């Protein structure tokens, strides 16, 4: 092989050039003799180069040449070389100096120290260690300190890096490590071995190590640890966490992780703290509405209402005023309607007076809305709203607007639900309210369902409704919806009423045979 350096197109020396030739060049330039062991082999192993030998003259040592030799032998990491840090395996770093080095050896390589560079080497080593510690602190804050899937890392906590760190600081660094998933974990949470569990210290250390309590509460992993602290925490712990979260509690209520923290914290709060929460939540009514509209925010508001009901009754008027001012908006939202339902369930009619007035005055607008329709049906349920006065007031408003509601795609369900309550007094009021309009309702797609529902009730006199239908019998026999009402009236009526219906059917039988809806009646009744 030609004893010359070969240079490729990138300006790098060919890896087949011998280290011996390079060492000879170095020796010639520095007027120093090479040790015999370095001349005895054509390809030198890195271990033969990494030792401290006083035979080397510090003034003659060329770190750049030695590094280029290692790179030529493919023992240097090109990525690290670009950053100015030559790399060797971790166990070889410890042969050079006592410090740093992890499973991938992200430490610093120092040249063999001679008498000339002895103090300079110590200063450089101390500077690099300080830089390494500072880098670790910055990496932890920026969450850039990571392990790969096989446990490799920069090794900041391994070997003898902490030898020069005082015990207190060393423990402060070691208490937090980063697992293979990139999430910071506190050792004190994983095990109680060798330490006394203290909630205050744990809560304080979490905030100091991870950031503010707000950041902890919104983190997928740390929020669970914060929940554990709240669950078993003392009053001092709860106060500390509450002070850290109260400012951003509106944002936490709609956060997927912070929501659970807030709900658990509200259950542990004192009456004074609940007052502060009410102050913050109701300060901006638009924020309050957005929380109620949110699928998880509405749950937090319901938990707050429960806590107010149990431990802060003096705050009921304040929270009810806030809810009543936006009640119409809340009733029309699929999530916020449960806030209204929770108020009717927990509070008395006197406490809900203003809210009940708002809902009653806008009963028709609420009933013709899809979500409002569902809300009213749930309000009629005795189990959901035990207060009879509230239920009776809402039912009365529905009966008052029954005619218009029967003609609506959503409102007709509210009227049918009132019928299904099977309250004789309320049913009689509804039947009388719709008199002289049954023929009109029977020709409507939605109203026909209400008329059929009333005809099937056993507690009322169906003859009253059938007689009212006879006012428009000629059109009903040929109507797409009215024909179903006539069929139902036939089957639920007694014989005397059927004879009346038969008379009108036979009078219009020719027209009915020419109409597909009239034919349905004839086929169904076998006429």
UniProtKB/Swiss-Prot annotation:
The pumilio repeats mediate the association with RNA by packing together to form a right-handed superhelix that approximates a half donut. The number as well as the specific sequence of the repeats determine the specificity for target mRNAs. SMART domains: Pumilio. The keyword RNA-binding applies. Its main location: cytoplasm. Keywords: Cytoplasm, Repeat, RNA-binding, Translation regulation. The gene is APUM13. This is Putative pumilio homolog 13. The keyword Repeat applies. It is found in: Cytoplasm. One of its GO terms (cellular component) is cytoplasm. Residues 184-527 form the PUM-HD domain. The lineage of its organism: Eukaryota, Viridiplantae, Streptophyta, Embryophyta, Tracheophyta. It comes from Arabidopsis thaliana (Mouse-ear cress). It holds the Pfam family PUF. Residues 24-41 have a biased composition (Low complexity). GO terms for molecular function: RNA binding. Pumilio repeats lie at residues 205-243, 244-279, 283-321, 322-357, 358-396, 397-432, 433-468, 469-503. Residues 22-51 are annotated as: Disordered. GO terms for biological process: regulation of translation. Sequence-specific RNA-binding protein that regulates translation and mRNA stability by binding the 3'-UTR of target mRNAs. PANTHER family: PUMILIO HOMOLOG 14-RELATED (PTHR12537:SF186), RNA BINDING PROTEIN PUMILIO-RELATED (PTHR12537).
